[in-house]
C-alpha cells in the first residue's frame, strides 16, 4: 500500500510513490500541464499534473480545483532546486474532498485590517504559517531548556485578588461581589513555587489594560516567567543569557525553511546565539542617550524610541541593569551599592526591537518588603500571603519574565507583535 506522508517528509521519499492529504493555495496551467501550489500544515510545495501521464478524469479534476480545495493525492517525489522547500510531486491521481469557491484571501494585496478580520483563514498562508512554526519552536526550546536545567513547570492562576505591579493597567472583574483582576503576571505565585520546588517557570497568557496602539503592545499576550530560590542577580543574568542564546540557536537549527519564507537575514541572528551579552548600567545608558542629543534625564524610564536607539548600537541582545527605584515595582531588592536603584535588569533585543525580557533579584527581607509595599501605596492585607514567604524560610531569590510575542517579533523581524500570536487582542480588536 502506498505510504501516506507529510510534505515535510518528502526528502525521505525521493523517487518514491506516496500519498498525501493537502490543500490548494494557488494554481496555474499551461495547456497540458497544471501546476498546483500545495500545503498540508507542515510545509508548502508544488504538485504537477501532466495530461499525458494521468487519466482525463484526473486532469479535469486538477483543472477544476479552486483555492483552498482539499484533496488526497498520489504521486512521485522529485527534487526541485527552484523551490524554498527543495522538492515537488508529480501527481498521478487525486481524490477531491472539498472544492468550494469564493475563498476571500486571494493572491492579490490585502490590507492588514482585512487580513486580521479573516485571521481564521489568514493563518493558512505562508507568512503566518512560518511565524507560528517559529513560535512553536521557541516554545519547545523554552520547555527543553528549563527542564534540562532542573526547573519545574508551575501554573499560576489567571484570576487574582492582588497585583504585582498595582491595578491601574488591569482588567477588573466582578467576582461574586468581590473585586478580581485578570493576571498581568504570574510572578508572585512563581515565587511561591520557587520556595517549594527550588526552581520553577510559569508560562501562560497575561492581560494588561493599556490603551496603547504601539507595535509592541497587545492587551492579551503570553509570558514565560522563571523564579529561582538561592539565586542572586548576577547568576540570574547568566541564566538569562544561556536561555536566550539557546532559544535563538534552536530556531536557527530547526527553522531554516520558515526563516527563508520570511526573508529573515539569519546572519543578524547568529550573534544572539553566541552569547556574550553586554551588561550596560542604567547610568551608562542615560549617558549614551544624552551624548546622542536625546532629551533624557536620570530617573526617566526608557520609551520605545530610546530603547530602539540603544538596541541599534549592539549586534546582539544586551542587558540594562540597575534601574532607579522610582520606575520599577515594589518587590525588587535595592542595590547595596546605590540604594536609589534596584538589582534589576531588562534584556534589549537588537535591530531596534527593544525590551524583550525583564527581571530582578527579589527583596527577601520581611520588614523591607513590607515597607516597600506601603511606599507603593498598596494594601498590606492583599499581600499578607506574599509576605509570609519572607516570614518563613526566606532565602535570596531572583526571577525574570519574557514577553513571548516580543521575542517572536524580533526573531522573525515583524513590524508588529500582532503577527506573533494566532489571534491578537488589541484595544480595537477582539475578533475573530
Swiss-Prot record:
Reaction(s) catalysed by this chain, per the record, are: tRNA(Asn) + L-asparagine + ATP = L-asparaginyl-tRNA(Asn) + AMP + diphosphate + H(+)
Q: Which UniProt keywords apply?
A: Aminoacyl-tRNA synthetase, ATP-binding, Cytoplasm, Ligase, Nucleotide-binding, Protein biosynthesis
Q: Which GO terms describe its biological process?
A: asparaginyl-tRNA aminoacylation
| UniProt GO cellular component terms | cytoplasm
Query: What family classification does the UniProt entry report for this protein?
Result: Belongs to the class-II aminoacyl-tRNA synthetase family.
Share what the entry says about its subunit structure, partners included: Homodimer.
Q: Which NCBIfam families match?
A: asnS, PRK03932.1
Record-given protein name = Asparagine--tRNA ligase
What species is this protein from? Lactobacillus delbrueckii subsp. bulgaricus (strain ATCC 11842 / DSM 20081 / BCRC 10696 / JCM 1002 / NBRC 13953 / NCIMB 11778 / NCTC 12712 / WDCM 00102 / Lb 14)
Amino acid at each position: 500500500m502506498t505510504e501516506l506522508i507529510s510534505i515535510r517528509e518528502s526528502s525521505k521519499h525521493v523517487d518514491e510513490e506516496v500519498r498525501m492529504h493537502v490543500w490548494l493555495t494557488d494554481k496555474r496551467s499551461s495547456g497540458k500541464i497544471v501546476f498546483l501550489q500545495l500545503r498540508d500544515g507542515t510545509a508548502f510545495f508544488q504538485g504537477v499534473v501532466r495530461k499525458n501521464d494521468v487519466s482525463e478524469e484526473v486532469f479535469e479534476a486538477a483543472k477544476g480545483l479552486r483555492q483552498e480545495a482539499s484533496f488526497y493525492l498520489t504521486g512521485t517525489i522529485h527534487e526541485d532546486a527552484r523551490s524554498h522547500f527543495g522538492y515537488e510531486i508529480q501527481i498521478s491521481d487525486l481524490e477531491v474532498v472539498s472544492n468550494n469557491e469564493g475563498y476571500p484571501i486571494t493572491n492579490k494585496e490585502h490590507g492588514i485590517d482585512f487580513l486580521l478580520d479573516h485571521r481564521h483563514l489568514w493563518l493558512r498562508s505562508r507568512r503566518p504559517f512560518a511565524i507560528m512554526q517559529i513560535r512553536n519552536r521557541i516554545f519547545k526550546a523554552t520547555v527543553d531548556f528549563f527542564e534540562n536545567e532542573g526547573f519545574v513547570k508551575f501554573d499560576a492562576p489567571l484570576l487574582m485578588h492582588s497585583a504585582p505591579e498595582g491595578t491601574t493597567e488591569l482588567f477588573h472583574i466582578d467576582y461574586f461581589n468581590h473585586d478580581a483582576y485578570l493576571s498581568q503576571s504570574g510572578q508572585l505565585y512563581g515565587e511561591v513555587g520557587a520556595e517549594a520546588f527550588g526552581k520553577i517557570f510559569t508560562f501562560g497568557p497575561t492581560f494588561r489594560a493599556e490603551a496603547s496602539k504601539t507595535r509592541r503592545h497587545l492587551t492579551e499576550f503570553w509570558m514565560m516567567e522563571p523564579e529561582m530560590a538561592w539565586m542572586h542577580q548576577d547568576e540570574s543574568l547568566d541564566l538569562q543569557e544561556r536561555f536566550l542564546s539557546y532559544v535563538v540557536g534552536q530556531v536557527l537549527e530547526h527553522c531554516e525553511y520558515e526563516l527563508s519564507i520570511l526573508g529573515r537575514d539569519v546572519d543578524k541572528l547568529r550573534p544572539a546565539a553566541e552569547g556574550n551579552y553586554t551588561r550596560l548600567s542604567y547610568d551608562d545608558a542615560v549617558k549614551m542617550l544624552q551624548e546622542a542629543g536625546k532629551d533624557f534625564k536620570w530617573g526617566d524610564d526608557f520609551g520605545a524610541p530610546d530603547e530602539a536607539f540603544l538596541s541599534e548600537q549592539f549586534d546582539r541582545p544586551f542587558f540594562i541593569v540597575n534601574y532607579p527605584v522610582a520606575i520599577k515595582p515594589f518587590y525588587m531588592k535595592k542595590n547595596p551599592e546605590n540604594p536609589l536603584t534596584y538589582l534589576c535588569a531588562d534584556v534589549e533585543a537588537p535591530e531596534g526591537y527593544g525590551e524583550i525580557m525583564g527581571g530582578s533579584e527579589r527583596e527577601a527581607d520581611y520588614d523591607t518588603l513590607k515597607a516597600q509595599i506601603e511606599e507603593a501605596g498598596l494594601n498590606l492585607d492583599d499581600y499578607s500571603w506574599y509576605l509570609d514567604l519572607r516570614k518563613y524560610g526566606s532565602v535570596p531569590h531572583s526571577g525574570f519574565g519574557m514577553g513571548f510575542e516580543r521575542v517572536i517579533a524580533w526573531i522573525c523581524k515583524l513590524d508588529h507583535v500582532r503577527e506573533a500570536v494566532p489571534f491578537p487582542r488589541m484595544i480595537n480588536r477582539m475578533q475573530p
